[in-house]
Amino acid sequence: FKEELESTYENVSCVLTSKNLGMGAGNNIGIKKAKTDFVLILNPDVVLEESTINELIVASRKITNFAILAPISTDTNHPNYRLLKNKKTWTKDETLFKVKSVDGFAMLFNKKKLDKVITNNYFDENFFMYLENDDLCERIRKINEDIFIVSNSKIKHLGGKGVNEKLKDKIELSRNWHWIWSKFYFNQKHYGYSKAFLE
């Protein structure tokens, strides 16, 4: 697979790990290997529009002080961002707006900027699955860096539609376990044990 991919596309470097490290740890490997000013994290279960990536690039040239840019989900019932406390909603004429956090299925990192302020891994590897993106966004906001949604860059998240029906129950059990652990760890890390146990 690796050899075929790299021989087909001359600008592609494929990194294979010996086991499933989880979303955060797996992405950390790629982020560290990247020598570019920007890094795009993109899950395999997304559908891009023709202009999705180009609109992110255009936005990155308009505002150079961002930490993360993200496209907007086309599923309005499940937004891929959390608004800041002082902002109740956004209007369609806002092509860029600051947010509290974004979902991890599509994020453009300003690597040149973040490498100067993130001393270790981008993603905390204690999270195997769930909330690793919220943790990163929380840490980024604590150092007064900005996260933006680019509303004319659109993306559809399928959300694990390719799950084998035979494994569905087992996968659901695993997901539930990881969600409970990640929520506990996130709350303990940012708000203390009392909130972690109460949530």
Where are the regions a protein language model picked out?
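Acidic donor-binding segment of Leloir-type glycosyltransferases
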Residues: 1-16
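Glycine-rich, basic loop-to-helix element that forms the pyrophosphate-binding segment
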Residues: 16-34
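Short aromatic/hydrophobic "clamp" motif used to bind/position activated sugar donors
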Residues: 39
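The conserved acidic donor/metal-binding loop of glycosyltransferases
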Residues: 43-47
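Conserved donor NDP-sugar-binding/catalytic core segment of glycosyltransferases
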Residues: 50-81
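Short, flexible, basic/aromatic active-site loop/helix in glycosyltransferases
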Residues: 82-108, 112
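A short, conserved alpha-helix in the catalytic core of glycosyltransferases
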Residues: 106-154
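Active-site-adjacent helix/loop segment of glycosyltransferases
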Residues: 138, 142-199
